[in-house]
Amino acid sequence: MREVISVHVGQAGVQIGNACWELYTLEHGLSPDGRLMDDSPSKHDSGSTFFSETGQGKHVPRRLYVDLEPGVIDDVKNGPYRSLFHPETMITGKEDAANNYARGHYTVGKELIDPVMDKLRRLADNCSGRQGLFVFHSFGGGTGSGFGALLLERLSTDYGKKAKLEFCVYPAPQLSSSVVEPYNSLLTTHTTLEHSDCSFMVDNEAIYDICKKNLGVAQPGFTNLNRLIAQVVSSITASLRFDGSLNVDLNEFQTNLVPFPRIHFPLASYAPLLSAPRRQHEQNSVEEMTFSCFESGNQMVKCDAKDGKYMACCLLYRGDVVPKDTQAAVASIKTKRTIQFVDWCPTGFKLGVCNEAPATVPGGDLAKVPRSLCMLSNTTAIAAAWNRLDYKFDLMYRKRAFVHWYVGEAMEEGEFSEAREDLAALEKDYEEVGTDSADAEEEGEY
């Protein structure tokens, strides 16, 4: 067995979780209460990666919902999927983190971490061959940043050898949910840098633009955004759950995408991004999808990939795709001069093909298509996201604005400068990996 446990932290984590589990149930032919639907085709026991089956034939998600305040999780308990989740795997506190990393990490969050680890241990005991853990959280919120970082620290201590992958909502360049987002994001990045093996980032603005421009949603809400994120998460995890001609497991992601431990922030792109009316006019061939994923309009983070160099690239196809077509698409990509790889990693492409076609939520924004592609690329272009964050952090921290709220919650002020230095080092790391080896040799000694 290759079980994966998902932990959804804070409002963003839980709401993305709702969209993901809604999609997983559709993909595995399960009803909202976790039972196999009569007309669903046999899924070859594929769901056991994410679901455990009870003696009564009910499928229960291997997942935890955690939030420091009860509001968002209460909505789940009263929503259409209330019977799907085990009530004990929904853990809430009494007061929220008030957009404050220090509250989520040091004071309010500290009280909740032991019950969370206890529940996680029970989920882990129920697995025969656990592959790893997914942690979903935002960088900007108090619970997502503070408690998310605390959780990853504890996971390193208790489950050191298992793969820990993050799905993070990164602060968008223009859209902001709170003034102190840059502080929270910088602090959580610094804390989790050594504890996370691979972090897939999405930013709300990039997703928002996709919903408006590609999918024709006039006023996208969080449900629209989260359902699109869920498609990306589903594609990344599809080969763990379904058979395929080229399967990719969790450890393979890391091996192929993370050349150095700190450079572990792949950029995700997805194709086709089609609404139902546009679907009739598009061919959606394997080559078309592959080229689309290299365009900035299909990326989940706002940055210009043409400004950077690729270190590694994972192409995860699903549906009606044959390996021969994927290899032909990659061959034509390699002839394009605009797509640059670092000179120390000349081949750079890892292919995955999963036979299960992508599912869509009835009444959702995305059209039903026979095939799709999710591209995960480790590129130096994502350093632009760190530059933006550091700039915003510096503007506030120069005046020590809002710092007293953090220090008042048992945090040392020195942690701010420590985190800032770490991020400066991360920017430098990205700069260095993008430098050609020949240039680096001329500068250094032999």
Swiss-Prot record:
Keywords: Cytoplasm, Cytoskeleton, GTP-binding, Hydrolase, Magnesium, Metal-binding, Microtubule, Nucleotide-binding. GO terms for cellular component: cytoplasm; microtubule. InterPro entries: Alpha_tubulin (IPR002452), Tub_FtsZ_C (IPR008280), Tubulin (IPR000217), Tubulin/FtsZ-like_C (IPR037103), Tubulin/FtsZ_2-layer-sand-dom (IPR018316), Tubulin/FtsZ_GTPase_sf (IPR036525), Tubulin_C (IPR023123), Tubulin_CS (IPR017975). It catalyses: GTP + H2O = GDP + phosphate + H(+). GO terms for biological process: microtubule-based process. One of its GO terms (molecular function) is structural constituent of cytoskeleton. The keyword Metal-binding applies. Residues 34-55 are annotated as: Disordered. Residues 35-46 have a biased composition (Basic and acidic residues). It comes from the Eukaryota. It holds the Pfam family Tubulin_C. GTP binds at Q11, E69, S138, G142, T143, S177, N204, N226. It is found in: Cytoplasm, Cytoskeleton. The record marks Y446 as: Involved in polymerization. Its cofactor is Mg(2+). Belongs to the tubulin family. Dimer of alpha and beta chains. A typical microtubule is a hollow water-filled tube with an outer diameter of 25 nm and an inner diameter of 15 nM. Alpha-beta heterodimers associate head-to-tail to form protofilaments running lengthwise along the microtubule wall with the beta-tubulin subunit facing the microtubule plus end conferring a structural polarity. Microtubules usually have 13 protofilaments but different protofilament numbers can be found in some organisms and specialized cells. This is Tubulin alpha-1B chain. It comes from Schizophyllum commune.
